[in-house]
């Protein structure tokens, strides 16, 4: 039988919440007897928006806003059925986007 792998990709704007969520997932998977690889920090995505400060003229006066998206990757190698059940029941904070691939 081939090795089964679950790949979990986490995204959030707040890196503290993201790290707490990753720690919860790693702790849960280790407790159920699965092998873990990660959390691996992926490059932070920066989106910059430039807007005019004035509504009418003065084009030289602009303001920039930045939005950062932090990402982490966790691989669970050889997960047990108990691992999958405990990950489904795991309560993670809002603001964290989770993608799971089998």
From Swiss-Prot:
PROSITE patterns: RIBOSOMAL_S10 (PS00361). GO terms for molecular function: structural constituent of ribosome; tRNA binding. GO terms for biological process: translation. GO terms for cellular component: ribonucleoprotein complex; ribosome. Keywords: Ribonucleoprotein, Ribosomal protein. It comes from the Bacteria. InterPro entries: Ribosomal_uS10, Ribosomal_uS10_CS, Ribosomal_uS10_dom, Ribosomal_uS10_dom_sf. The keyword Ribosomal protein applies. Involved in the binding of tRNA to the ribosomes. Belongs to the universal ribosomal protein uS10 family. Part of the 30S ribosomal subunit. This is Small ribosomal subunit protein uS10. It comes from Lactiplantibacillus plantarum (strain ATCC BAA-793 / NCIMB 8826 / WCFS1). The lineage of its organism: Bacteria, Bacillati, Bacillota, Bacilli, Lactobacillales. The gene is rpsJ.
């Amino acid at each position: 039988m081939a090795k089964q792998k679950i790949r979990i990709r986490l995204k959030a704007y707040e890196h503290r919440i993201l790290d707490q969520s990753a720690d919860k997932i790693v702790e849960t998977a280790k407790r159920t007897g699965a092998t873990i690889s990660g959390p691996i920090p992926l490059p932070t995505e920066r989106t910059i928006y430039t807007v005019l400060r004035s509504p009418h003229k003065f084009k030289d006066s602009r303001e920039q806003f930045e939005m950062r998206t932090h990402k982490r990757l966790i691989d669970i190698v050889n997960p047990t059925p108990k691992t999958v059940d405990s990950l489904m029941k795991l309560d993670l904070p809002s603001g964290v986007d989770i993608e799971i691939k089998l």
